[in-house]
Amino acid sequence: MAVQVVQAVQAVHLESDAFLVCLNHALSTEKEEVMGLCIGELNDDTRSDSKFAYTGTEMRTVAEKVDAVRIVHIHSVIILRRSDKRKDRVEISPEQLSAASTEAERLAELTGRPMRVVGWYHSHPHITVWPSHVDVRTQAMYQMMDQGFVGLIFSCFIEDKNTKTGRVLYTCFQSIQAQKSSDLTHLDSVTKIHNGSVFTKNLCSQMSAVSGPLLQWLEDRLEQNQQHLQELQQEKEELMQELSSLE
């Protein structure tokens, strides 16, 4: 029995100007990842009517298939300066997030629309467009504060194997909670045994990696203590001999 997963956001509408800014920022360097924040609005609607006017048929199809439509509209982006020294990591500081929120409030007053920080974007130079485990964990952290928060990834500086030409891929993603073991009722016995053996093997490997150095340290410490005890016993015997000679 398949488990249907319902995400907090059903679609994302990225303005062309914001898309060009993200794309140019991603193509600005191939040596490290770049990042930024997205400003826009989140529309909630329980009807599938013409309120959302899109030129693409894909957006319209999504709006027709769901009962409660939650669509993120990204109108502007803010380019951020890197704060992580690792080239394959990006990190948004609280100060940067606060400054982006202030800018969103300014745009809200200027346009009269409920602008706010609705997501973040970053680049993947020379690697796949799919989010890494770090990206998924970071996205989950943001979604704890705002379920409508989305993440965008721009994969660039990659070559099409067939045409030998460069291409740029981009995607939008959100994090979801993993299925509980009780939901996996469709697994057969062989799969369960295999999963159990893999889990046991990984657990033993982790325990060995943790307990191995600890046991070695305890053995070295025991050897040092025994040697020190012998030295103390020898010193005690020498002192007893000196004491007996004085008597």
Curated annotation (Swiss-Prot):
Subunit structure as annotated in this protein's UniProt entry: Component of the ARISC complex, at least composed of UIMC1/RAP80, ABRAXAS1, BRCC3/BRCC36, BABAM2 and BABAM1/NBA1. Component of the BRCA1-A complex, at least composed of BRCA1, BARD1, UIMC1/RAP80, ABRAXAS1, BRCC3/BRCC36, BABAM2 and BABAM1/NBA1. In the BRCA1-A complex, interacts directly with ABRAXAS1 and BABAM2. Component of the BRISC complex, at least composed of ABRAXAS2, BRCC3/BRCC36, BABAM2 and BABAM1/NBA1. Identified in a complex with SHMT2 and the other subunits of the BRISC complex. In the BRISC complex, interacts directly with ABRAXAS2. Identified in a complex with ABRAXAS2 and NUMA1.
Organism from which the protein derives: Pongo abelii (Sumatran orangutan)
Presence of the UniProt keyword Cytoplasm in the record: yes
Sites of Phosphoserine modification: S189
EC number(s) given by UniProt: 3.4.19.-
Name of the protein this chain belongs to: Lys-63-specific deubiquitinase BRCC36
Gene Ontology biological process: cell division; chromatin remodeling; DNA repair-dependent chromatin remodeling; double-strand break repair; mitotic G2 DNA damage checkpoint signaling; positive regulation of DNA repair; positive regulation of NLRP3 inflammasome complex assembly; protein K63-linked deubiquitination
Gene: BRCC3
Residues that hold Zn(2+) according to the record: H122, H124, D135
Residues covered by the MPN domain: 12-179
MF (Gene Ontology): cysteine-type deubiquitinase activity; metal ion binding; metal-dependent deubiquitinase activity; metallopeptidase activity; polyubiquitin modification-dependent protein binding
Record keywords: Acetylation, Cell cycle, Cell division, Chromatin regulator, Cytoplasm, Cytoskeleton, DNA damage, DNA repair, Hydrolase, Metal-binding, Metalloprotease, Mitosis, Nucleus, Phosphoprotein, Protease, Ubl conjugation pathway, Zinc
A cellular-component GO term for this protein: BRCA1-A complex
